[in-house]
């Protein structure tokens, strides 16, 4: 009697799509793990016994940073602690439940700091003027004070490679400075050390990773400020370059890591008479008094 033939179930379009999604997610996670791990090693970002505070805004970058650091923590050669912190600035319409619900599901220690900096910014900044400078200084001042009070040794921010390049061009175009965001920034008084674990990661990879991981993204509705508009112009320029000239952004980023002071024109970095390098000005997180009374909030320039 012939054996009964059983037909194997055909793959449905949905299951094939899910398989491709899973493969893409695994590939992206490996790439981001590698890039974050390399940045941590290259710049000595995290050391044994560190307490790392991941600053979460609810955007794709900070979600991805926390996710990758939690992943790396499991297999890291050194033991370090991770906590997540969000500053609720009391922006109208900010969904207060989203981050706590997500962080509860992740099982990580977290803190939500409630400070109404939104009202301060609206009160102090004239209509039509950029809010970014004051808003970021107030935000960082609060976060840095919190870090010191809670024994945090490293403050992790979610800036990625594209942010570093955009900041370089913003400073060149509008500030007359050859200046970007460093992967690690130490304060002069030793209070704070800021790290940027995503320094090697591309924004488009982070955006796709966040989409595949289905992070509960919270949009920022506070500003349509001039600084953000200027940054958007540069971002669009980079996107055009990336399409028309693949590899250009990678080469530009390598230039940030390969500076030759003798071929620039800054006498603070190079003694052109003696033909030797100088120490230059040390850039760091500096505590500064606000120009106006903003209450008991320290303003830190970064």
Curated annotation (Swiss-Prot):
A GO MF label: magnesium ion binding
Compartment list: Cytoplasm
Reaction equations catalysed: cytidine(32) in tRNA + S-sulfanyl-L-cysteinyl-[cysteine desulfurase] + AH2 + ATP = 2-thiocytidine(32) in tRNA + L-cysteinyl-[cysteine desulfurase] + A + AMP + diphosphate + H(+)
Top-level class of the enzyme under EC nomenclature: transferase
A single cellular component GO annotation: cytoplasm
Binding site for [4Fe-4S] cluster: 132, 135, 223
Keyword Metal-binding among record annotations: yes
Iron recorded as keyword: yes
Cofactor note as given: Binds 1 [4Fe-4S] cluster per subunit. The cluster is chelated by three Cys residues, the fourth Fe has a free coordination site that may bind a sulfur atom transferred from the persulfide of IscS.
Keyword annotations from UniProtKB, A to Z: 4Fe-4S, ATP-binding, Cytoplasm, Iron, Iron-sulfur, Magnesium, Metal-binding, Nucleotide-binding, RNA-binding, Transferase, tRNA processing, tRNA-binding
Extent of motif PP-loop motif: 57-62
InterPro entries in alphabetical order: Rossmann-like_a/b/a_fold, TilS/TtcA_N, tRNA_Cyd_32_2_STrfase, tRNA_thiolation_TtcA_Ctu1
Requisite cofactors: Mg(2+); [4Fe-4S] cluster
GO term, biological process aspect, one: tRNA thio-modification
Pathway in which this enzyme or protein is active: tRNA modification
EC number: 2.8.1.-
Assembly, per entry: Homodimer.
Function, as annotated: Catalyzes the ATP-dependent 2-thiolation of cytidine in position 32 of tRNA, to form 2-thiocytidine (s(2)C32). The sulfur atoms are provided by the cysteine/cysteine desulfurase (IscS) system.
Further remarks about this protein from its record: The thiolation reaction likely consists of two steps: a first activation step by ATP to form an adenylated intermediate of the target base of tRNA, and a second nucleophilic substitution step of the sulfur (S) atom supplied by the hydrosulfide attached to the Fe-S cluster.
Family label: Belongs to the TtcA family.
Name of the protein described by the UniProt record: tRNA-cytidine(32) 2-sulfurtransferase
Species, as recorded: Marinobacter nauticus (strain ATCC 700491 / DSM 11845 / VT8) (Marinobacter aquaeolei)
Organism taxonomic ancestry: Bacteria, Pseudomonadati, Pseudomonadota, Gammaproteobacteria, Pseudomonadales
